[in-house]
Curated annotation (Swiss-Prot):
<keyword id="KW-1015">Disulfide bond</keyword>
<dbReference type="Pfam" id="PF00021">
    <property type="entry name" value="UPAR_LY6"/>
</dbReference>
<keyword id="KW-0964">Secreted</keyword>
<dbReference type="GO" id="GO:0005576">
    <property type="term" value="C:extracellular region"/>
</dbReference>
<feature type="disulfide bond">
    <location>
        <begin position="87"/>
        <end position="104"/>
    </location>
</feature>
<feature type="disulfide bond">
    <location>
        <begin position="48"/>
        <end position="84"/>
    </location>
</feature>
<keyword id="KW-0325">Glycoprotein</keyword>
<protein>
    <recommendedName>
        <fullName>Prostate and testis expressed protein 13</fullName>
    </recommendedName>
</protein>
<comment type="similarity">
    <text>Belongs to the PATE family.</text>
</comment>
<keyword id="KW-0732">Signal</keyword>
<feature type="disulfide bond">
    <location>
        <begin position="30"/>
        <end position="60"/>
    </location>
</feature>
<dbReference type="InterPro" id="IPR016054">
    <property type="entry name" value="LY6_UPA_recep-like"/>
</dbReference>
<feature type="domain" description="UPAR/Ly6">
    <location>
        <begin position="28"/>
        <end position="114"/>
    </location>
</feature>
<feature type="disulfide bond">
    <location>
        <begin position="33"/>
        <end position="41"/>
    </location>
</feature>
<feature type="disulfide bond">
    <location>
        <begin position="105"/>
        <end position="111"/>
    </location>
</feature>
<feature type="glycosylation site" description="N-linked (GlcNAc...) asparagine">
    <location>
        <position position="57"/>
    </location>
</feature>
<feature type="signal peptide">
    <location>
        <begin position="1"/>
        <end position="20"/>
    </location>
</feature>
């Protein structure tokens, strides 16, 4: 009996969304990378998932790290972390010269792609997205 129940739960969770099937997404998929340099993931891009049921837990998180440049007086982008942790947006001064900025997104799957960085040019991001679309086809 338990095996049939478990099988039915997995069928519902992994069911393909089509026009004949009335489903809603129970899972949120996010990118997972511990060192994203603004262009690519240094240690390999992975994915993670979480249940998309509770409003406070359905976000994908991007943590941008900035270091303070003494010569210019500006915080410059260093790297980003992409993950599935519960998110609290905002800025946090980690050390005297390291700042962490956290972005949360809930609009779609894999929405934490590292493009929420203000130091990256929008022209470069559009070019990266076009290359990605061409490679996906």
């Amino acid at each position: 009996m338990f095996q049939k129940l478990l099988l039915s739960v997995f069928i519902i969770l992994l069911m393909d969304v089509g026009e004949r099937v009335l489903t809603f997404n129970l899972l949120r998929h996010c990118n997972l990378c511990s060192h994203y340099d603004g262009f690519k993931c240094r240690n390999g891009m992975k994915s993670c998932w979480k249940f998309d049921l509770w409003t406070q837990n359905r976000t994908c998180t991007t943590e941008n790290y900035y270091y303070y440049d003494r010569f210019t007086g500006l915080y410059l982008f260093r790297y980003a972390k992409l993950n599935c942790k519960p998110c609290a947006p905002g800025m946090y001064q980690m050390f005297h010269d390291l700042l962490r900025e956290t972005f949360c997104c809930i609009d779609r799957n894999y929405c934490n792609d590292g493009t929420a960085n203000l130091d990256t040019s929008s022209i470069l991001i559009e070019d990266m997205n076009q290359k990605k679309e061409l490679n996906d086809d």
